[in-house]
Amino acid sequence: MSKDGNLDTSEFDPLANKEYTEEQKQTLEQEQKEFLSQTTTPALEADDGFIVTSASFAQSTPSMSALSGNISPDSQTSDPITKAVRETIIQPQKDNLIEQILKDLAALTDRDLAEQKRKEIEEEKEKDKTLSTFFGNPANREFIDKALENPELKKKLESIEIAGYKNVHNTFSAASGYPGGFKPVQWENHVSANDLRATVVKNDAGDELCTLNETTVKTKPFTLAKQDGTQVQISSYREIDFPIKLDKADGSMHLSMVALKADGTKPSKDKAVYFTAHYEEGPNGKPQLKEISSPKPLKFAGTGDDAIAYIEHGGEIYTLAVTRGKYKEMMKEVELNQGQSVDLSQAEDIIIGQGQSKEQPLITPQQTTSSSVEPPQYKQQVPPITPTNQPLQPETSQMPQSQQVNPNLLNTATALSGSMQDLLNYVNAGLTKAIDSNKQIDLIKEAATAILNNEKSDIAEKQANIIALAENTVNNKNLKPDAKVTGVNAVLETIKNDQNTPNLEKSKMLEATVAIVLNSENLEPKQKQQMLEKAVDVGLSLKDDASRAAAIDGIKDVVIKSNLSPEDKMLIAVGDKVNVSELSNAEKQKLLGSVLKKGVEAQVLSPAQQQLMQQHLYKIMAEQTKKDTIKKVNDILFDPLSNTELKTTNIQAITSNVLDGPATAEVKGEIIQAITNTIAGSSLEAQDKAAIIKGVGETIATHSDTSLSLPNKALIMASAEKGIAESQTNLPDRELMTKGLVDGIYEGKGGPEITKAVSSGIDNSNINDSEKEALKKAKDAASEAALDRDTQNLTEGFKGQNIEEHKPHDDIYNKAREVINAVNPVIEALEKSKEPVVSAEERIVQETSSILNNISKLAVEKVNNFRAMLSPNGNLKTLEEKKEEAIKKVDELVKAFGTKSSTEEQQSFIKTNLIDDKTLSKEVRLQTIDKLLQEQKRSEAIENPSVKTEDVRVVSGKSKLKPISKDNPDIEKAKMVVGRDRVNIKGNIKIMGALMNARDIIQSENLNKSTPIKRESSPPQR
């Protein structure tokens, strides 16, 4: 090569860096012909060789990468060695390969396709005899692949390769007279170790370029299998420390190292193949590694950087003097120097991998081979690694079974060993060829598996490759829309099932895949949603909650940031998937709440979507509340230290908390149904269960109307009965509990609507008709018994409605008293009168007659009023309405009492509002006192450690959660305690005493304190 870079093959020898006269050229050509006509003795060993010049040189093995055009066209080739490689090796191989392809096409059943390909070959051959376009087209790989399966063709290609190497090395060797040509390496043993050798390489001027070091490795024998299934043991190989950077002297250097046989010896020259490194003079004059060439398919003995390279050639195994780590270093340097690797193994690995699944890996005692993906920037120089199946044990001869490995997986892994782009090319070619969508999906899935199983790739590279595969699937024009969905979902499923990728890294893959899908212009919204939902499913299937949260958060953010319009963003789909997942309610509540919050903030959820998601959230919260509530109920029911009365009180408190909660009436009904169902299904005695159920019914019936309307009470009561009816206990027990529920309603003075709700609960329960009829009879019997009790206590009931001052007998008594009071002055006046107008008897008779007449009218009026009050058509308030007013007043008084913080204020309240205020009926005041006494007793129980306090709840539902006892940290339960309830025990006793004293005073009140009638012994004398 001249200094100005101009090339002239007819006048310039790049190796000798000199020009020849015409006479010298003719003499040299004659010497070459004579040399080529000589035969080489097969017994002669092949030698390592090197050539040192200041000119560029390229040597190559026959390769499919060369067939694909990696070597520049003839018009651009000036290097005589490269030209010789092309003419003696590559082109003859191409000719033989095309000949076999045409034979295969002649036998192809699809005649149209066969004719199309035949014409394509013939037409291109007229333009370019190298057929670079044909061999470079991925769509033609299936034909190349099939041709290479022919054993006769393989033998021809191998013989061409061996003869070509022999020819090139002999033609351009120093021994043949070629100036500055190849010459054997003179290795010198290291003085301190027999397994180390070295040689110094110098340029034409005698300046040292580098020192090569060779190490002979004697290892414990390991076994590998050839393609035909036979086994070979390797016990010795060598490593050469090929230089990466050369900066000692100027010039070019080409190292060609012979591959060793399995026993560590050199093959004969007629079977030799070589690993060659080409160092070309760089801009600064120093040699730069620009190209390497190696025999066909190159494999490595393991996954570590110290794994030795090997090939199978001519049915024999050969080891090369380069390790995996050194090979990668050299490839990176080639890329850095913008060189070109003419590497048969890379391209042929891909082609052979497509059609020959029987390609077997090398197996070592300590490690297995595996696919390897180099960083993308080195993708054109990535060494091919054939994947492995099961490793052999040390010193064990075991033949790998090809049927144990998925052939397609070998194909994808082999393609991936070249580069990610090679894998995508292979996949796309397969997608184009495959008509069956199932085969297309299988191919995509196998590619994803190969990526994730590649042990040489770090996690970042795996992520990048998975994303590239997903993007390739979305954008592939040969896939139908539904197939794209299935293909991407197959990639997602592969991510899900991969056992080696950490969960947090999986979540990143999901996030990136969703971003590709949502931002794609090649998908419809329906298809995008299907892929999005699959990604969410995979994210929710991750093994730990942190990874699941990371996955959903990442997907959520991608959805919000996607290029879709706000109304088209599919965040609701994420929420729906979370809602129907099998996660715990607590985790679903957390995830769904996060999605809803973010969606509202980003304004990507419509009002209807927000409402729907909020409903889902409420339902999840209700489910969790139900679960927690049932646990508390079970703890109470199975507490051996509490009696039925205490169990009832505690479950009443739980029931009250449910009724006071923020959930809808329907949800409250579901929880109450679960409570009664749990009670009914417990192992308690039937009478005890009925007593507890009665307490539940009473709590519902007496609950404040301000937080629970009458229709909602009825709905919840129906649910309570449904829980009883659908329990798995026997029918007599259910009948008894139904009676208990009805008794609780009457005890709580519930109206007819509440009682009727019990029948509704029976009707809506999932039991047979005979059981429904039996439960209704039990309900009716309980109602009749309660009505009988009410009839017997009717008078007491009237007292409770504040009508005692208006009873007829009281009015008659008062009017009689008025008569006496009116008559006495008349009598006294008559006695003093000296001139009486009429006699006293007449006057008394007249007055008495008038008074009695008035009394009669008043009695009739009172009786009529009494009848009107009892009449269903009367205009007066009904008994139920007056009861409700009384209950409401009691609640108001109790609430007002609760606002008093000190004992003195509470005592003053009792005197002012309960003892002195006679405008309130006795019944209201007494009920208020009873309710306040109940609260004081609860407060006492809380303060007194000797009193059972587990699961006590204040009806108000506004308490703070505090531990039961600091002395018992093992107790997990908690109690709800209102701050004011934690009073001093002495003050508590004072209040209870004041309440009981007030109760006695109210109960002893006279119905009327008017003066008794003054009785005379005889009428006055006239």
Swiss-Prot record:
Protein name according to UniProt: Antigenic heat-stable 120 kDa protein
Stretches for region Disordered: 1-41, 355-403
Keyword Cytoplasm recorded: yes
InterPro entries: Rickettsia_antigen_120kDa
Main location: cytoplasm
One GO cellular component term: cytoplasm
Compositional bias ranges of the Basic and acidic residues kind: 19-34
Gene, per the UniProt record: sca4
Cellular compartments annotated: Cytoplasm
Organism placement in taxonomy: Bacteria, Pseudomonadati, Pseudomonadota, Alphaproteobacteria, Rickettsiales
Biased composition (Polar residues): 355-380, 387-403
Protein keywords: Cytoplasm
Pfam family, one: 120_Rick_ant
